[in-house]
């Protein structure tokens, strides 16, 4: 299975959107894969499809009825199994941390488990995005998707959260972040979870995992020893333990079996 991941052409969108991909019902067979924790906020728009989400599995199939639906995925701490009983029409958008807030006002109210299977922040959101399925050419679909997103765009700054995210990107400890920003660890954690939908420790662990993937993919780290110290782990056993907690696989087994989708990684079953 080949899925092309597109990055936005708009400089405004590139600041907040990592990218997007399309799937359709033309040809293809049932398939399934595992996707692994990340810090993106992922929105999928589906046409004429049914979606059932459980704690560690999402099952998609063609619907007997004509309909469109949107789903939201922003928090899973272990591999998520995604099963396509039949191919479906789908557009999936990867928003960067705090990115989706620039397109959906009051996004915090949707960062609850109940929002994942049915994400309808406002009437035009689903209808405008699902209208892209009626466009035949991929290049025109991409242009229209960017137009729709720019139509939703309204910048919402949060300098405090930006500072937290920047420090996490530099792998600064939670204790040190609270000291630098002169707030309690409790307030820091509560504020972060309200805005991002996951705990600081979850985010930090996932960020280390994603950096490991990028280092191996880019060739910057040539073995697991280099990968351990590039990610500021004390030793390889600590690195392997954290890695297995996220993937359910050892690093060696994971890199042997996984397949890259540009900015994400899947394990095809």
Where are each of the predicted segments found?
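Alpha-helical bundle regulatory/interaction domains
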Residues: 1-162, 166-175, 181-185, 199, ...
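Alpha-helical DNA-contacting segments of helix-turn-helix folds
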Residues: 159-160, 164-166, 191-216, 242, ...
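Flexible, glycine/small-residue-enriched loop-and-beta-strand segment within the central core
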Residues: 220
């Amino acid at each position: 299975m080949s899925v092309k991941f597109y990055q936005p052409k708009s400089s405004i969108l590139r600041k907040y959107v990592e990218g997007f991909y399309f799937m359709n019902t033309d040809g293809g067979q049932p398939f399934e894969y595992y996707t692994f924790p990340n810090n993106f906020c992922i929105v999928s728009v589906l046409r004429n499809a049914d979606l059932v989400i459980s704690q560690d599995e999402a099952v998609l199939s063609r619907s007997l009825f004509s309909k469109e639906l949107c789903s939201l995925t922003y928090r899973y701490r272990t591999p998520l199994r995604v099963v396509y009983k039949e191919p479906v029409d789908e557009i999936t958008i990867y928003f960067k941390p705090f990115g989706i807030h620039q397109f959906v006002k009051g996004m915090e109210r949707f960062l609850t488990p109940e929002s994942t299977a049915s994400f309808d922040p406002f009437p035009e959101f689903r209808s405008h995005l699902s209208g892209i399925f009626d466009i035949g050419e991929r290049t025109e679909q991409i242009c229209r998707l960017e137009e729709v997103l720019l139509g939703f765009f309204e910048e919402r700054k949060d300098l405090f959260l930006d500072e937290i995210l920047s420090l996490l990107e530099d792998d600064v400890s939670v204790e040190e972040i609270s000291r630098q920003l002169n707030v309690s660890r409790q307030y820091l954690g509560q504020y972060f979870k309200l805005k991002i939908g996951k705990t600081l420790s979850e985010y930090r662990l996932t960020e280390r995992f994603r950096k490991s993937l990028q280092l191996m993919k880019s060739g910057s780290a040539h073995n697991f020893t280099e990968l351990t110290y590039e990610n500021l782990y004390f030793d390889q056993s600590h690195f392997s333990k954290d890695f297995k907690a996220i993937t359910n696989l050892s690093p060696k087994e994971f890199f042997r079996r996984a397949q890259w989708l540009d900015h994400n990684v899947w394990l095809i079953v």
